Amino acid sequence: MRRFLRLIAFLLGIHVAGLLMLSLFRLVQFGALHSMMAKDGVAPVSTAFVKGVWFDNVIACYVMVVPLAVLLIAACFGCYAKWLRKAAAIWLSVFFILFMGIAAANIPYFAYFFKNLDSSIFGWFGYVGTTTGMLVGEASYWPYIILFFVAALLFALGVRKWYKITDRHISSPQSSLLQKDSGKVGKNPTSLKATAFAFLAKLCVSAALIGLCIFGIRGRMGYNPIKISQAYYCDDPFLNQLGISPTYNLLTSVLDDLRKENAELHLMPYDKAVDYARQSLGITSQIDSTAVLHRHVAADSAAIRPNVVIILMESMSASLMQTFGQSQPLTPTLDSLYRHSLAFTHFYSAGIHTNHGLTATLYSFPALMMRNLMKGTVTPRRSGLPTVLKQEGYHNLFFMTHESQYDNMNAFFRTNGYDEIYSQESYPSSEVANSFGVPDKYLFDYALPVINRAASAGGPFMATLLTISNHPPYIVPQWMKTRTKEPETQIVEYADWCIRQFLAEARQQPWYDNTLFVILADHGKLVGEMDSELPQSYNHIPLIIFGPGIQPALYDGLGTQVDVMPTLLGLMHIGYDYDGFGVDLLRERRQQVFYTSDTQIVARDSASCFIHNPMLGRDFCYDVLPDGRLRQTHDDRRFQPLRQYGFAMVQTAEFMQRHSK
């Protein structure tokens, strides 16, 4: 058994030494680049180093699991072959030295790009001579190159020394399963029992260690495995990125690029698409090579700065409201608000997933079919409503029901304008209802005192609340008295009731009278019949705005989630620089809108709806009837303007997404 334990010590020693060397490179990066830290930051630096070890350990466990399993299982059967340990030492040394090389290269890369190494570096491999000349010719890179070679040499020598030290205690002639570690065969029953017990003990320890290593690869016990978002713990982008393993960052970015949903769209040439999009949005300013839609939106009068509360309701299709033809009284609160607020009749979600709704509503960027624009090894940077309001002195809060890692929300929102993030990790575990976290009522109950605290600080705030209950699995509280019998409709009643309760409690707060409320859905869901290739209920959603100075009115023009930001800032008379796809609906009436699903692109005007499926290469054309229903037509020629509009807008978004990295 001693030999077995020393074998474990041999592997563990290399593992720990590798983590220490990677931490050394992180320390060097901090020392060299600490001036990049936020000037007024108060976050503890030590947390970044702890998270860095955490991510380094994930990568280390990936390379450790094979030699660990092979050596321990062989040892269970009495095999302590020297060549196996040599192979393991070489295997681990090569990989840890590779990781050190990536960590060393990451320091000057981060200094230049303010991001960790990602798959974009492979674009340099096509210019070997130029890249080599840059690395050798730039004197500021030499210290890191020298550091790498010194560290690699020391690590290799250290592993060699450690191998020799442990080898003296492990090496002995190969023995069989029924031999003791001393090499003598026990012939009496007691000796056989002891040998069998030792075998079982080794097997159990091996299974436990291999299991721990696999758990180390997963990185955490939560619903999701570890993701980049886990490194984000404060408002300082330098410290958040310091806690990410450069190797982990590089590998996951490569995997991201290989995902089918991230394949480049080719609907029309980029130059034609951009020209059309700029013309459609009325942009006349000089074009930037990458920020092709950039323009300044001037304020039309003195700015007002009310508080802002945005509620994005999960899957709340307009078809669930009696206002839009629902036969059952599922949403009395929303229907009442619709009649007494600034409400929008023909309003559509950008996509059919939550991440699409968030990106479009808050940052005015449209959905790109199935692609998740909040995720990525390199967290995307976007300007939008949170960043503009933060510049105006707002304190921004985001409340979600589920884990903050979901859809990379923690990293994305901290990077793009939010000061505080509240998620499942913030709530008592006893309140978690399912894999999507806490129910809507608890979300609102938790958020209200936090909002009160933000309001008491004296400055304006923006609070964004993302609900979840109207998403399977539906969990309707037993105490909830509903009018309907099916869980799928009962949960809509519950979601609507939660809005009523929150607004009733908010109405008692001193900040209520100076707050703009925006209520909409993140996307819709299938309700009723399949009325087209992409049923309208998936994207047709309510938009309700009320607050100080907002006169109740019904807006019957077209609009989508990308219009929320410019419309809301227009109501507040705030000027801003803008890269988005939206318009202020109260000052400019849209002639057309576009949106997508995972496999379809939709463009529509008041009379027609065009749907294109790129995978099938097919178009579907519909006339919009007076009652809002669709009737398919095969007169494709009439739909060419809509086709061009939809293709141009989506292709422009594709261009901007690819050039924002």
Provide a role label for each language-model segment.
Residues 3, 7, 45, 83, ...:
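Exposed alpha-helical structural elements
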Residues 83, 261-272, 374-378, 581-583:
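Short alpha-helical "patches" and their helix-cap loops
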Residues 280-661:
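Solvent-exposed soluble domains appended to multi-pass membrane proteins
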